[in-house]
Amino acid sequence: MTVEQNVLQQSAAQKHQQTFLNQLREITGINDAQILQQALKDSNGNLELAVAFLTAKNAKTPPQEETGYYQTALPGNDRYISVGSQADANVIDLTGDDKDDLQRAIALSLAESNRAFRETGITDEEQAISRVLEASIAENKACLKRTPIEVWRDSRNPYDRKRQEKAPVGLKNVGNTCWFSAVIQSLFNLLEFRRLVLNYKPPSNAQDLPRNQKEHRNLPFMRELRYLFALLVGTKRKYVDPSRAVEILKDAFKSNDSQQQDVSEFTHKLLDWLEDAFQMKAEEETDEEKPKNPMVELFYGRFLAMGVLEGKKFENTEMFGQYPLQVNGFKDLHECLEAAMIEGEIESLHSDNSGKSGQEHWFTELPPVLTFELSRFEFNQALGRPEKIHNKLEFPQVLYLDRYMHRNREITRIKREEIKRLKDYLTVLQQRLERYLSYGSGPKRFPLVDVLQYALEFASSKPVCTSPVDDIDASSSASGPLPSQSLPSTTEQQGPCASDLPGSSSPASGAALPLRSVIHKPFTQSRIPPDLPMHPAPRHITEEELCVLESCLHRWRTEIENDTRDLQESISRIHRTIELMYSDKSMIQVPYRLHAVLVHEGQANAGHYWAYIFDHRESRWMKYNDIAVTKSSWEELVRDSFGGYRNASAYCLMYIDDKAQFLIQEEFNKETGQALVGMETLPPDLRDFVEEDNQRFEKELEEWDTQLAQRSLQEKLLAAPKLREAEASATTAQAGGADYLEQPSRSDLSKHWKEETLRVIAKASHDLEDKGPETVLQSAIKLEYSRLVKLAQEDTPPETDYRLHHVLVYFIQNQAPKKIIEKTLLEQFGDRNLSFDERCHNIMKVAQAKLEMIKPEEVNLEEYEEWHADYKKFRETTMYLITGLENFQRESYIDSLLFLLCAYQNNKELLSKGPYRGHDGELISHYRRECLLKLNEQAAELFESGEDGDVNNGLIIMNEFIVPFLPLLLVDDMEEKDILAVEDMRNRWCSYLGQEMEANLQEKLTDFLPKLLDCSTEIKGFHEPPKLPSYSAHELCERFARIMLSLSRTPADGR
């Protein structure tokens, strides 16, 4: 090692130590140098532990057991991700492990530096900090020992768990393991990685190897991972259980189920284990000094750090795996990468050293699979816990990395200088434009064009020759004195025309005194007289002055508009130039295609993970959300992953070399040349394992079928007597009209239909006394139809809906076919209940005869039945709505919710056929949303009480009514109010994470939160629609009018 290298390394170590102490001082507020030095020594240079020790007011060496726990949880890492045994030795490392400790917990710690430090989110260490700040370490260690509770429960019906043909397989969430599912599915869908895992064979002398900790852990994990991958390939189940692999991982993390595992940390640990496992195998199969490790070749690349430290140049080659990127302060992935590749000034402990320091990073070798960690967490010093950054960050489907390659460094430097020059010029232009768009010297600023326009309008207004005060006094003399509030300030409004007003001794002056005591009544005393000008105007201006002023203002306004337009066009051109700076052919030779996006929703201490993975065979995006695997789209991915809109955002991006087709290429049979699919891709031992599992599942299906057959037979035997009784009663029932009229009581028909029918028949009979029943029938039908058309066209208040009074009003408003309307009218006049009235008997007979004469080709019976079925659904929807709103007003929110959910679903189906088929969708949506918010509030209050019974009741409300129905607010058009309501409910529960609470409450909260934060739009449970009681049309109309009137009296902000 050279003297220069010694100097550089010592300088770097001193720099890191001083930076470490500065950070501790900033975070904890402790200025005692001895305490800080002691914390540095006790934590072995680990910032998280030092913060925890100092915050706990214990700067002495902690007990060995505590230290062991934290250090075991710490993954071995350098600044750019684990290199393991593959790291280069004997090189100058100015950016290695030293800085990684700084950036993992606190992104704000180096705000003065342009370099984006690595954050990996909610690691075990960061959660340890949070727990120390919230309670003592001893209290939280009690939470570590508990039984895992499954988030998902298997359906008893195995057919619900049966895999559709060739459908992707999900992974069961076995207790806060959505992080495991997201990462494993992303890697499994890399066919090369899948092949490596499936075809892995442990070393032949594995039984004879010394069982150190790594080998004791890695070999069982590889066995379970192979089994898991084999099931994902060939199982007949919709989803599989990863419990055995997860348990091995959890043991290594020394974690507990109450913590949400961090995707980056887990991926890092997983690749470390895989690297170790394949290294053992590689060393057995080759005698080379450095055997090739397929995991290293797949996931690890190299970069060259070039720079100057205190005036001395250096170069350092390092290996990297997952590449960390800072999100805060950047709008897209390229900006993050640019900041990561160029580091500004490197601080020096020697303040008198004037030598410049800085460095650049250039990729020399990119891995086939390139993973970016998006650092979305920062440490909030005030709250004492990590917080999530929800800023929007865009990323492309194809990422060109030519500009970051070492071989392109010269042309990239030139382009960076050009971009810097353009951005500097852009800043100047934007500042100039801002002066035009925000003009003024006071706190309120306006566009200069508008200022000139307002001045022009004022100058052009018609002058007023009398004082506005005089006008008001004259116009209001009949109605008494005006309140002082309505008088304009004389210093502002009173011009030369008002100078003749009397002085202090005048009557006007004396009359002004009582005006102060007059009570101001809006819309009465202060009403503006109709002859008063609406806008101020200049009192005196000559034609010449006005002409000159208008000319100047017009000219200036045109000049400003031209200048503004020129600036905006120049800014747009510069933006476009910057965007296209790297679009030339030489800079699009290294394409990487987006393979997977790992998404996190929630806050720093808890949340839910899922993955979007590109199906290269079908060329479409798939969403992997635990057991649910669904088709998706780029638009949905963007909505959930870019951030800035909801609490969901991308946390990890996995790109693959677009030219490395072996990553996604299927395996082929060497003899037949056919692609191997499914079980054909599995080695014999795994094929046997999957077949055995499939046989167990098929047996479960057979047993279920047998149980169903036995149950069905028993039900038929029990139902036979009831069926015979029902058939007997059906034969005696009278044949009626549409089934929505079949109520237990016929009084409804007599009040609504019969009375009106009798009235029109009486009128038609009176007008046509000497005519036969057929003529009277035709006249009565015309009269009734005219009445119904008038009702359908009438503009009514919300409480009056004539569609509920008569089916034909509903048909007319929705433009039903003429033949259907005619047939329904004939059924009204042919109703058998009219036979009891002597005047109507013959007319009823004629109507029935005409009904029988209608041929099937004249009226489409299916369409006819469909229209009447829709009307029945409309009436049922109305009853659901009425009952739901009545329960809401009684504050019976659970019952209200169930009825409103049915009303919303039925109404949605009706409105899909026409705008007048159902009720106001916004009204139902509003009260459905309010029900969920009210129930969430009730559940939260019960949880906050801390009483076991209340806590359980609160969680029952959440699990039974909130969690299953939240997805209903996130489907369809996703109204902004619904999305905000969901966010409010989730944030309410996430806020408890930062509060002190009993261990059992913490346990229940952590079990419940992943279900609440699940972004899936899959409905996980739905109650049977509540049964509606028998009701009459009269009752329906009355209750509808009553509830709608009560709503109209509710203030707008209460609805």
UniProtKB/Swiss-Prot annotation:
Record's compositionally biased regions (Low complexity): 474-489
Keywords noted in UniProt: Coiled coil, Cytoplasm, Hydrolase, Isopeptide bond, Nucleus, Phosphoprotein, Protease, Repeat, Thiol protease, Ubl conjugation, Ubl conjugation pathway
Domain spans labelled USP: 169-658
Cross-link (Glycyl lysine isopeptide (Lys-Gly) (interchain with G-Cter in SUMO)): 99
Gene3D superfamilies associated with the record: 6.10.250.1720, Cysteine proteinases, DNA helicase RuvA subunit, C-terminal domain
Motif Required for SUMO paralog-specific binding, chain ranges: 89-95
Protein EC: 3.4.19.12
Single GO MF descriptor: cysteine-type deubiquitinase activity
Knocked-out gene: effects: USP25-deficient mice are more susceptible to various viral infections including H5N1 or HHV-1 compared with the wild-type mice. In addition, loss of USP25 protects the liver from oxidative stress-induced injury. Knockout mice have increased seizure susceptibility.
SMART domains for the chain: UIM
Keyword Protease: yes
Any single biological process term in GO: mRNA metabolic process
CDD domains registered for this protein in UniProt: Peptidase_C19I, UBA_UBP25, USP25_C
Record GO cellular component, one term: cytoplasm
Active site: 178, 608
Induction pattern: Induced by type I interferons (IFNA and IFNB1) produced in response to lipopolysaccharide (LPS) and viral infection (HIV-1 and SeV viruses) (at protein level).
Protein's UniProt keywords contain Electron transport: no
Record note on modification: Acetylated.
List of residues that carry Phosphotyrosine: 740
Subunit structure: Homotetramer, inhibited form. Homodimer, active form. Interacts with ACTA1 (via its C-terminus); the interaction occurs for all isoforms but is strongest for isoform USP25m in muscle differentiating cells. Interacts (isoform USP25m only) with MYBPC1; the interaction prevents proteasomal degradation of MYBPC1. Interacts (isoform USP25m only) with FLNC (via filament repeats 17-18, 20-21 and 24). Interacts with GAPDH. Interacts with SUMO3; the interaction sumoylates efficiently USP25. Interacts with SUMO2; the interaction sumoylates efficiently USP25.
Described purpose of this protein according to its UniProt entry: Deubiquitinating enzyme that hydrolyzes ubiquitin moieties conjugated to substrates and thus, functions in various biological processes including inflammation, immune response. Modulates the Wnt/beta-catenin pathway by deubiquitinating and stabilizing tankyrases TNKS1 and TNKS2. Regulates KEAP1-NRF2 axis in the defense against oxidative assaults by deubiquitinating KEAP1 and protecting it from degradation leading to degradation of the NRF2 transcription factor that is responsible for mounting an anti-oxidation gene expression program.
Protein family (similarity comment): Belongs to the peptidase C19 family.
Protein's name in the database: Ubiquitin carboxyl-terminal hydrolase 25
